UniProtKB/Swiss-Prot annotation:
Organism the protein comes from: Influenza A virus (strain A/Budgerigar/Hokkaido/1/1977 H4N6)
Residues marked Essential for channel activity, possibly by being protonated during channel activation, and by forming the channel gate and the selective filter (site): H37
Gene name tied to this protein: M
Protein name: Matrix protein 2
Biological process (GO), any one: symbiont-mediated suppression of host autophagy
Domain writeup: Cytoplasmic tail plays an important role in virion assembly and morphogenesis.
Description of how the protein assembles with itself and partners: Homotetramer; composed of two disulfide-linked dimers held together by non-covalent interactions. May interact with matrix protein 1.
Length: 97
């Protein structure tokens, strides 16, 4: 069995595509896997920052701040935000003089 499914052959009218065994279960499975792979790749590229940040930091929002004064909570939030802001930059700007 050949994995080649389409053969272009010259005819009097031009080039024709003859598909053989297009109902083969292996070809159908490969097509479905290929389409799913393409969809997952597109979603990954669209949402990579959100997905990988979630994997890196987990689903937790951080340690509990119960019983901690509001000023310390705000300081902690600012520290966490600065860490996330640093993580957002994938590119480094280099200025040449």
């Amino acid at each position: 069995m050949s994995l080649l499914t389409e053969v272009e052959t010259p005819t009097k009218n031009g080039w024709e595509c003859k598909c053989s065994d297009s109902s083969d279960p292996l070809i159908i499975a490969a097509s479905i896997i290929g389409i799913l792979h393409l969809i997952l790749w597109i979603l990954d590229r669209l949402f990579f920052k959100c997905i990988y940040r979630r994997l890196k930091y987990g689903l937790k929002r951080g340690p509990s701040t119960e019983g901690v004064p509001e000023s310390m909570r705000e300081e902690y939030r600012q520290e966490q935000q600065s860490v996330v802001d640093v993580d957002d930059g994938h590119f480094v700007n280099i200025e040449l003089e």
